[in-house]
Amino acid sequence: FIHVEGVPSKDFRQQRIDLSSYTAVIFTSRMAIDHYFRIAKETRFSVPDQMKYFCVSEAVSYYLQNYLVYRKRKIFHGRQTFKDLMELVVKHSGEKYLVPCSDIQRKNIPDQLEKNQINFKNATLYNTVCSDLSDLKDVKYDVLVFYSPSGIQSLIKNFPKFKQNNTKIAAF
């Protein structure tokens, strides 16, 4: 129902974000990691070795190995939620944080950072876009599973006259 498109480097530059002025990056997903390093490459920004990385989970932190050598002294991770990660971020409150995110970032992330007086800036590096599903008009499904509100918005956009009938709907 949805897909992700990277923000072009031209649009990123219009956000007036100087990547070199940040000492730490907060990653909430693998997608954020991919697009952070994509933008760094497109803007010819050489990520410094002393950059610190804060990841929402251990799985996300291990994904960083695709882009850099994994060092425990500069990569930190929470247990699974952003609230867990905030404990580590608060311990390193002297850092200047960049938060790579989608155009539809959850509000709890900036709210928690502001509440704890963390110096941060959101960087929209990718957009969540409704996929064109017009070719599926006549197909009937037993179950539709949605993993985010964006999927439901895509259903409504693609099929404005959608009737549930006997179709079961599940949400994660």
Question: Where in the sequence are the language-model features?
Answer:
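Signature of uroporphyrinogen-III synthase
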Residues: F1-F172
